[in-house]
Amino acid sequence: MADEPKPISPFKNLLAGGFGGMCLVFVGHPLDTVKVRLQTQPPSLSGQPPMYSGTLDCFRKTLMREGITGLYRGMAAPIIGVTPMFAVCFFGFGLGKKLQQKSPEDELSYPQLFTAGMLSGVFTTGIMTPGERIKCLLQIQASSGENKYSGTLDCAKKLYQEFGIRGFYKGTVLTLMRDVPASGMYFMTYEWLKNLFTPEGKSVSDLSVPRILVAGGFAGIFNWAVAIPPDVLKSRFQTAPPGKYPNGFRDVLRELIREEGVTSLYKGFNAVMIRAFPANAACFLGFEIAMKFLNWIAPNL
């Protein structure tokens, strides 16, 4: 028999989501570094090859020039930001589901799950944008040959000194454009696959680890299929010199399409997709493990 439905606890989602986010960063950061460097590399001069010819070339050159630490450059910022960010993300999803339920027995439709996921994207933008801004600046400085920042705190301090609090929130609109629809797709896909993988008469809470990993991994792939174009624009905008794009993302979009074509909106696609499966598989597995632990120690929380 299937278990009785449990009331949704946004607070448990908050705690378990933070742990899931930490798992995601440790697994996925090296390829995130590759992704950002591919997205922000300047156009190659006539007759000269680009700095990186692709995902594997960027990975190899980073490893050769900077060692394994180069692949984890800038990780402190997402670790500091990602725990509360994923906590808030899963909290927003849990709250979005709870607001649409009249009782714990109500099964939400997939459009309702998509809506709950979009709410989580709105919730996370305030935390996500500063961390992404610092992370991107640190990730590209080594490949550009400029060492303006010695680390996460130094980057944060200099950003504040130069631009004030607004310096941390450069790219907020693009972060919203990326995360709101992508988060809806993320959670809807995960819930759909969990239901698909659950044998008849069983509970989704009894899913095996391999099935959770597959559901989480494909949720990450579907998420990034939606998110890549605005993510490319965001990375380019957040790492640009002050004043380069006075009209915001519209200027970035026009420049990219004019100089590099529509395919430039999918720069870093291979790195993103290679990273998306293992990183998000780790995230959802971490979330489910933490949730089981919380349900065990505090069933009525």
From Swiss-Prot:
Positions where N-acetylalanine occurs in the chain: A2
Membrane side Cytoplasmic: residue ranges: 2-12, 94-112, 191-211, 288-301
Species of provenance: Mus musculus
Compartments (UniProt record): Mitochondrion inner membrane
Protein name stated in the entry: Mitochondrial carnitine/acylcarnitine carrier protein
GO terms under biological process: carnitine shuttle; carnitine transmembrane transport; in utero embryonic development
Record flagged with keyword Transferase: no
Family: Belongs to the mitochondrial carrier (TC 2.A.29) family.
Membrane topology classification: Multi-pass membrane protein
Substrates-to-products reaction catalysed: O-acetyl-(R)-carnitine(in) + (R)-carnitine(out) = O-acetyl-(R)-carnitine(out) + (R)-carnitine(in); an O-acyl-(R)-carnitine(in) + (R)-carnitine(out) = an O-acyl-(R)-carnitine(out) + (R)-carnitine(in); O-propanoyl-(R)-carnitine(in) + (R)-carnitine(out) = O-propanoyl-(R)-carnitine(out) + (R)-carnitine(in); O-hexadecanoyl-(R)-carnitine(in) + (R)-carnitine(out) = O-hexadecanoyl-(R)-carnitine(out) + (R)-carnitine(in)
Tissue: Widely expressed, with highest levels in the liver, intermediate levels in heart, testis and kidney and low levels in brain, including cortex, cerebellum, hippocampus and hypothalamus.
PROSITE patterns named in the record: SOLCAR
PANTHER family registered for this protein in UniProt: MITOCHONDRIAL BASIC AMINO ACIDS TRANSPORTER-RELATED, MITOCHONDRIAL CARNITINE_ACYLCARNITINE CARRIER PROTEIN
The keyword Transmembrane helix belongs to this UniProt entry's keyword annotation: yes
Modified residues (N6-succinyllysine): K170
SUPFAM superfamilies: Mitochondrial carrier
Solcar repeat copies, ranges: 8-99, 108-196, 207-293
Gene: Slc25a20
Transmembrane region(s): 13-31, 74-93, 113-131, 171-190, 212-230, 268-287
Gene3D superfamilies: Mitochondrial carrier domain
GO CC annotations, alphabetized: cytosol; mitochondrial inner membrane; mitochondrion
Origin: domain of life: Eukaryota
GO MF, one example: carnitine transmembrane transporter activity
